[in-house]
Structures are given as structure tokens and as C-alpha cells.
């Protein structure tokens, strides 16, 4: 692989319920500006959570993330977030998104979150098993790897 070449990592996971707080963080000025730069839009104030059956640390070792560093904002600690530019399969084709892992997350290490320009739930395939297909753009790693739930 050429130095700096973009490779793809495809994850196949299952949607899971979140804690209901993702929207508050995505809409926070500290994070929303970073997501706006990455996605080219104001992100929908919420996340779609999925169990990738892959520990986020393993993902980070295969595909180097961008990092939004932690900070203190008006006396409140905001944790660092790992971010991967990606696309999610919807009934309309692939949609640009960001796969994220907040480092202060209370989710199991295999649960990742997706941030996008629009609410994803209505445009995902109506499949009873709640499958999610995400393709992450990597700057290093193998050409294509599959992780199945």
C-alpha cells in the first residue's frame, strides 16, 4: 500500500439502545464544530449506537482515528472522542457519517456511535435484525476486513 493511501474497513453490527444523551454532546459547541468540519454540515443532534462486535481499541489499532481532545468548558469536563470518517448503508445508498467512540463512554467497548447530517433511523433499512453496515476510511491497515455480528 502506498504511504497515505486510503483503505476501507467494513463493519457489520447491530443497532443497540443508547443512554439518550448523545444529542446533548453532539449539539455542544465544542463537539459540533468539529463534526461540522468533518461532515460539511451541522450534525443531527443525536447518535445511532451499534454493537460492532469489535473493541474500539482494536478498531483504533487497525484504523487510526482522528482525536477530539478532552477539555473543560465552563467548568464541565468534556472527554476526548475518537472519530473515524465513514459511510453508512441506508435504503437510499451510502450516507456520509462519523463513527465515534467517546473515551468516557459507559457503553461496552464494542459499542460505537454514529453521527450524521440527518437522523438515520428513518432511512435505515427496515430489517428485523437491526443490522448496520458501516465503511470506515482508513489511512493504514489491510485493504478490506469484515467483522460480522
Curated annotation (Swiss-Prot):
- Keyword Magnesium applies: yes
Pathway assigned to this chain's UniProt record = Cofactor biosynthesis; FMN biosynthesis; FMN from riboflavin (CTP route): step 1/1
The protein's superkingdom reads Archaea
| InterPro entries per record | RibK_CTP-dep, Riboflavin_kinase_archaeal, Riboflavin_kinase_CTP-dep, Riboflavin_kinase_dom_sf
Q: What is its EC number?
A: 2.7.1.161
Catalysed reactions, semicolon-separated: riboflavin + CTP = CDP + FMN + H(+)
Reply yes or no: does the keyword Hydrolase apply: no
Free-text remark on how the cofactor is bound: Binds 1 Mg(2+) ion per subunit.
Q: Which cofactor does it need?
A: Mg(2+)
**Residues binding FMN, per UniProt:** 105, 113
Q: Please state what class of enzyme this protein is.
A: transferase
List residues binding CDP: 18-23, 118-121
For this chain's UniProt record, which GO biological process terms are given?
FMN biosynthetic process; riboflavin biosynthetic process
* Entries under SUPFAM superfamilies matching the protein: Riboflavin kinase-like
Which amino acid positions bind Mg(2+), per UniProt? 47, 49
Give the Gene Ontology MF terms in alphabetical order: magnesium ion binding; nucleotide binding; riboflavin kinase activity
UniProt keywords (A-Z) are: Flavoprotein, FMN, Kinase, Magnesium, Metal-binding, Nucleotide-binding, Transferase
Which family does the record claim for this protein? Belongs to the archaeal riboflavin kinase family.
| PANTHER family (alphabetical) | RIBOFLAVIN KINASE
Give the function comment from the record: Catalyzes the CTP-dependent phosphorylation of riboflavin (vitamin B2) to form flavin mononucleotide (FMN).
In terms of HAMAP family, this protein maps to: Riboflavin_kinase
Please report the name of this protein according to its UniProt entry: Riboflavin kinase
The organism of origin for this protein: Hyperthermus butylicus (strain DSM 5456 / JCM 9403 / PLM1-5)
